[in-house]
Amino acid sequence: MIRTLAIGILSTFILACEKLPDPVVPDTPREENNEGKENNGNDNSGETDTTMPETIKITVSGKTLPVKIEDNEATKALVEALRTSSITYEAHDYGGFEKVGSLGLALPSSDTQITTQAGDVILYSGNQIVLFYGTNSWSYTRIGKMEYGTLDELKVFLKAGQGMITVTLSL
């Protein structure tokens, strides 16, 4: 008898719930009229962001390091190219102190005689990117500096002395 009563109450409850009206969804808020207001930089008008970033990214074997970039014509041209898409190229060891590879495009160069340090990202001959894990003195255009932990960690990241790597540059 109790079981029959419980089934009856449950059935009545289910039927009652089926007859409830759909929940009322409040109106979505109206967009504010921004006429005459200053643009705070948060609109999505579709305009391309042309501010110069402070860093780009270098990815090797699925691991990424930031590169603090210089403010020069080469980096401006590189960032402009990276706004379109990332750039992937092959780099190989050279001289026991660097990985070098052709970028696949020419960048403006402003070569000066410099002594590189581990972590430097350098433009060579206008179209090659050099990633240093040692030092060298030559006439280069500085792109930036990889932000890394220890020298040993940088060498592992770049697979120093282990031949060809695939490098991806991105924003």
Positions of predicted regions on the chain:
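Sec-dependent signal peptide recognition
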Residues: 1-8
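Bacterial Sec-dependent N-terminal signal peptides
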Residues: 8, 13-51
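Preference for short coil/turn "hinge" residues that link or interrupt alpha-helices
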Residues: 8-13, 62, 66, 96, ...
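Short linear motifs in intrinsically disordered
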Residues: 35-51, 78, 111-113, 119-122, ...
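Short, charged N-terminal helix-start/capping segments
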Residues: 42-61, 100-102
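N-terminal secretory signal peptides
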Residues: 54-96
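Glycine-rich active-site loops that engage anionic ligands at enzyme catalytic sites
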Residues: 86-171
